[in-house]
């Protein structure tokens, strides 16, 4: 389960970086060259999704929980926004959902 969770975290980071760089270009006046690493990051994200150990729909459902948690950590570390109790509670519920789904596919 730890290996799967770490793979989900790396996958989430690839997706977030791939989306954040165009945001910097479009909204913050960044260089158009940000689109090149963004495209590479999104390609890495798509490839990483193929490494997960079960059917794609189940992977996407479980991955969503980890994505929520990683996105909130990004909000805190990169955007400098203090997380609320609701943020932490939402992340905990999302991660619990991911764990339940992952336990189910490991038993199948």
UniProtKB/Swiss-Prot annotation:
SUPFAM superfamilies: Multidrug resistance efflux transporter EmrE. GO terms for cellular component: plasma membrane. Pfam families: UPF0060 (PF02694). Keywords: Cell inner membrane, Cell membrane, Membrane, Transmembrane, Transmembrane helix. The chain crosses the membrane at residues 6-26, 31-51, 61-81, 85-105. It is a multi-pass membrane protein. Its main location: membrane. It comes from the Bacteria. It is found in: Cell inner membrane. Signal peptide: none annotated. Belongs to the UPF0060 family. NCBIfam families: PRK02237.1. This is UPF0060 membrane protein CJA_3703.
């Amino acid at each position: 389960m730890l290996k799967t969770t770490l793979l989900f975290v790396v996958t989430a980071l690839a997706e977030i970086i791939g989306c954040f760089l165009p945001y910097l270009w479009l909204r913050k006046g960044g260089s158009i060259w940000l689109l090149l690493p963004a495209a590479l990051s999104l390609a890495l994200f798509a490839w990483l999704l193929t490494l997960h150990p079960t059917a794609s729909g189940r992977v996407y459902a479980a991955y969503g929980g980890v994505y929520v948690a990683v996105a909130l950590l990004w909000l805190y570390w990169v955007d400098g926004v203090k997380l609320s109790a609701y943020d932490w509670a939402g992340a905990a519920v999302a991660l619990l959902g991911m764990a339940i789904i992952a336990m189910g596919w490991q038993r199948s």
